[in-house]
């Protein structure tokens, strides 16, 4: 389970990360590990993980190379304004490296995102 998030320590990203952390063991029991990716610098990622008690890896993709390859970097509308940035996306990748499901920005509800993932896995 890999997910991209726009910015550490913002309300939506914090809600999403905390949801995933709260259900980390349930996700692990189904064979999925959590990996977060954002454009934030490593120091901010570390502080975010420490202050929120996140016990999964956070990748600092400051050059957006991985984010672009994953299709998580592009045009979006924020507060009625078009910008280029991270598109909040989650990929469920199985043990063979095959993408089973992509949760798009329109599908993701940050506060209950882990439950959304578990619901999909258990359907």
PLM ranges: what are they?
Residues 1-123:
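Chalcogenol-based redox active-site neighborhoods
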């Amino acid at each position: 389970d890999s997910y991209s998030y726009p910015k550490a320590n913002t309300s939506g990203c914090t809600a999403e990360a905390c949801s995933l952390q709260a259900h980390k063991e349930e996700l692990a029991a189904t064979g999925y590990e959590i990996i977060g990716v954002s454009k934030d610098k490593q120091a901010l990622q570390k502080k975010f993980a420490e202050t929120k008690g996140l016990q999964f890896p956070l990748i600092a993709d400051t050059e957006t190379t991985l984010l672009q390859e994953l299709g998580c970097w592009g045009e979006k509308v924020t507060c009625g304004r078009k910008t280029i940035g991270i598109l909040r996306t989650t990929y469920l990748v199985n043990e063979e490296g095959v993408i089973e499901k992509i949760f798009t920005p329109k599908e993701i509800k940050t506060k209950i995102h882990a439950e959304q993932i578990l619901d999909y896995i258990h359907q």
